[in-house]
Amino acid sequence: KALPLKARTKVYFETYLPKRDANNSNVYQPANNDWDLEFVNSPEAADVILLWLIPKGPSLFEADGSPLHVDLSSNNIDVKYVNGLIAKKPTILAINYTNPWAIDQIYDSASPTVEGILATFGTTPEALLDIVTAKVQPSARMPFSTPISDAAAQNQQSDVPGYQEAGDYALFTFDEGILGY
């Protein structure tokens, strides 16, 4: 059981937000440590990695009629970098779901080091830490289904919600979630 994180756990907390002309990753070091965790500057020094991915797809206003892809590599996430990072230590993935991202490039059920996945929706690092430490009990449900892959999204019936798609369309389904630890 990876969550909640226990007191004094050594945590490498990295946010990964694609930026123009800047480093995409940022090691988060809170000014005030209200979580009884030890924040470290490298994955090697950590007991666990908390990696928060914030994919950035094209604006719908920029749409040119071509397919919108939901895989992470098409949405400014360096999956080679992410896979290298999560291979180092047990990892909690947090993903900001502005779209129903397909995360198969970095996760499947056999992923040996990914011990938990959290969906965020425009929150703050502090709120994420409140959840992973149980300072606040999680209580959330997915507002949509996420496709198991970009290919599944491209081949879906466009007029059918993901939770009504047949077979193995979804990795996470509509209304799936957690209510406390």
Q: What is the role of each PLM region?
A:
Residues 1-181:
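C-terminal non-catalytic regions of proteins with extracellular/luminal or membrane-system context
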